[in-house]
A protein has these predicted regions:
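N-terminal J-domain/J-like co-chaperone modules of DnaJ/Hsp40 proteins
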Residues: 404-499
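C-terminal end of P-loop GTPase domains and the immediately downstream helical coupling element
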Residues: 200, 206-402, 406
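Cytosolic juxtamembrane amphipathic/interface segments immediately preceding
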Residues: 25-29
Length: 499
C-alpha cells in the first residue's frame, strides 16, 4: 500500500507544482512516510502525560511541573545531539540552550509567552524515539480554556484541517464524559472513518487507584478491564492498559543512593517503617528517621534525613516506597534487580508490548493513512481541474487496500455494528489484526510456531470463515465481515514462508 500512496502523492505534487503551498504540504507527506510514527500523548491536566513520556524514553526530558513548557505542544524526536527549538506562531524558529537541572532537561523559553508559540521541538539521542516521535500535549479540560484549546486544535482541529499525529495514547484517571468527547472528536476522520485502531487508552497513575496499597495495581487492572468492556470506550480505543508512570520512570532511572536509602528503610524495625509509611505526613515527620536499633531513638548513622525522604517521595511516591521496601525484604538485593521489578510491576512492559504490536508493527499503514487523509483534504478544497484523476486514484487505493478494510471493519466491530455471535466476533477481530498483525498473533499461536503450524492454522481458519461467509442465517453486514476475514486469511497464506 505504501508504494501506491507514494505514487499518488508524487502525481499530486506534479499536478500542484504551480501552487507552492500545496506542493510543499504534499512533499511533507512524502517525507513523513520515511519518518518515525508520530504518537501524541493526551489527557487531562495532572493525568501524568509527561511522566509517562519520560518513562517511555527512559530519561527525564519532558518537564513534569506546572511550568510554562507544559502549556505548549512539544515534540520529542530522535537526534544525534540534544537540541531544543521553539517555533513561534509568527516569525522564524529559535534555538534554546540545552541544560539539565537536578538530572532533568530544563527548557527556558527566555521570556517568550507560551501563547506565542506554535510548538517546541526537542531532539534527543534515544533508541525509543527512533521508532516513534512522541508529542506531549497540554491538558484538556484545563482551568485555562486557552491551554486546553491547544490540544484540541492540534489533535481535533475545528477548521477541517488535519492533525499531525498518526496515533494517540490517551491518559485518564477515571472515565469522564470529557474523555469520551475528546476521543470521539479525534476519531472523526475521513480515511478509515472512526477507526479506533490508532488510539490506546492508559489508566494513568494506576498505583493511586488502591490508595497507595502494595496490591493497588491489581485493583487498577480490574478497573481497566471493566473500562475496556464498556461499549462507548471500546468503540474509541484499542485497549486500556493500567500504568504507574512514576514507578516506571523511577525503575528506569534508579540511582544507587536511592537503593541504599530504601534498603536502610526496609531493614529498620518493621513497626517503625510501617508507621512511617502510613501517609506522606508520617513519612516526612521530623521524628521519623529510618534504620534505628530502637524505633524511638534512631541512630545518626542510619537515619534518613528529611531531605532524602522528600526526594524519595518525589521519585517513588508512597506506593513506590512501600513496594520497594517490601521487595527488598523479600530478597531483591541489587539496584538492577529492584529497577527491573519496579518496571515490571508498573505496567510499562505491557504498554510497551501493546505499542509495539498495535502501533509499531502497523506504522507504515498508519502513516499511509495519514498521507491519504492529507491528500483527500487537499482534493476536497481544490478547484484544479486536474484533480479528478487523482481523486480516482485515491478511491482505487482505498477500495483495493485490504489493510484499510481491516481498519474500518475493526472499528465497526468495536462499535457493535457487526452482528456476529460472540465467539466468532472475537476470532474475527483477532484474524483481522485487532491484537497485532503478526500471523502467529492473528492465528492465536505461540510466537515460535513453525511455518507448517502457521500454514495449517491459516488453512483451518480460511475454511471456517468461508463457511461462515455462506451461512444463510448471518445478516448482510455479518456476511461482508466474514468475506473480509476470508481475505485476511488468504493474505496470510500467500505471505507465509514455506518450509
Amino acid at each position: 500500500m505504501s508504494v501506491a500512496v507514494r505514487g499518488v502523492l508524487r502525481r499530486a505534487v506534479d499536478v500542484f507544482r504551480d501552487e507552492p503551498e500545496i506542493a510543499k504540504l504534499l512533499h511533507q507527506q512524502l517525507d513523513r512516510l520515511d519518518e518515525p510514527l508520530r504518537v501524541a500523548i493526551a489527557g487531562k491536566v495532572k493525568a501524568g502525560k509527561s511522566t509517562l513520556l519520560n518513562a517511555l524514553v527512559g530519561e527525564d526530558i519532558a518537564p513534569t511541573d506546572a511550568g510554562e513548557c507544559t502549556r505548549v505542544v512539544t515534540w520529542y524526536q530522535d537526534g544525534r545531539t540534544p537540541k531544543v527549538v521553539m517555533y513561534p506562531r509568527s516569525g522564524p524558529p529559535t534555538s534554546l540552550p540545552v541544560h539539565r537541572r537536578d538530572g532533568a532537561l530544563a527548557i527556558d523559553l527566555q521570556g517568550t509567552a507560551p501563547e506565542q508559540l506554535d510548538r517546541l521541538v526537542v531532539d534527543w539521542p534515544s533508541q525509543s524515539l527512533r521508532t516513534a516521535t512522541l508529542i506531549d500535549t497540554p491538558g484538556i479540560a484545563s482551568a485555562s480554556t486557552e491551554i486546553a484549546r491547544r490540544t484540541w486544535a492540534f489533535l481535533a482541529p475545528e477548521d477541517d484541517s488535519l492533525t499531525e499525529a498518526d496515533a494517540v495514547i490517551y491518559l485518564m484517571r477515571h472515565l469522564h464524559s470529557a474523555d469520551a468527547q475528546f476521543l470521539e472528536s479525534f476519531q472523526d476522520q475521513t480515511v478509515a472513518r472512526a477507526s479506533s485502531v490508532n488510539t490506546i487508552a492508559v489508566l494513568s497513575r494506576a498505583d493511586e487507584v488502591g490508595g497507595g496499597r502494595v496490591d493497588g495495581m491489581f485493583s487498577a487492572k480490574a478497573i481497566a478491564r471493566r473500562y475496556q468492556a464498556e461499549p462507548t470506550l471500546r468503540s474509541l480505543c484499542q485497549t486500556v492498559i493500567p500504568v504507574a508512570g512514576l514507578l516506571a520512570l523511577t525503575g528506569r532511572t534508579l540511582r544507587q543512593a536511592e537503593f541504599a536509602a530504601l534498603k536502610k528503610l526496609a531493614h529498620s524495625p518493621r513497626e517503625h517503617a510501617d508507621a512511617m509509611l502510613l501517609s506522606v505526613d508520617h513519612f516526612l515527620a521530623p521524628d521519623h528517621s529510618a534504620g534505628s536499633s530502637d524505633s524511638e531513638t534512631p541512630t545518626s548513622q542510619n537515619a534518613l534525613s528529611r531531605e532524602i525522604r522528600h526526594s524519595l517521595l518525589e521519585r517513588f511516591g508512597l506506593f513506590g516506597i512501600r513496594l520497594s521496601t517490601t521487595l527488598i525484604r523479600q530478597g531483591t538485593d541489587t539496584p538492577s534487580g529492584l529497577a527491573a521489578e519496579l518496571v515490571r510491576r508498573s505496567g510499562m512492559n505491557e504498554l510497551a508490548e501493546v505499542l509495539h504490536t498495535l502501533f509499531t508493527q502497523r506504522s507504515d499503514l498508519l502513516k499511509a493513512r495519514s498521507a491519504l487523509r492529507a491528500l483527500e483534504h487537499v482534493l476536497s478544497s481544490s478547484t484544479n481541474a486536474a484533480t479528478k484523476d487523482l481523486g480516482g486514484d485515491v478511491e482505487r487505493i482505498l477500495g483495493g487496500a485490504h489493510e484499510l478494510t481491516e481498519l474500518r471493519l475493526l472499528s465497526a466491530m468495536r462499535s457493535d455494528e457487526v452482528d456476529l455471535p460472540r465467539a466468532e466476533h472475537a476470532e474475527a477481530e483477532r484474524l483481522l489484526g485487532g491484537s497485532g498483525v503478526a500471523p502467529a498473533v492473528r492465528l492465536s499461536l505461540s510466537a515460535d510456531a513453525n511455518p507448517a503450524q502457521l500454514q495449517q492454522a491459516a488453512l483451518e481458519a480460511l475454511g471456517r470463515w468461508q463457511r461462515h461467509a455462506e451461512n444463510p442465517l448471518f445478516s448482510r453486514v455479518a456476511a461482508e465481515a466474514c468475506r473480509a476475514v476470508v481475505r485476511s486469511c488468504e493474505g496470510m497464506l500467500t505471505n507465509l514462508p514455506r518450509e
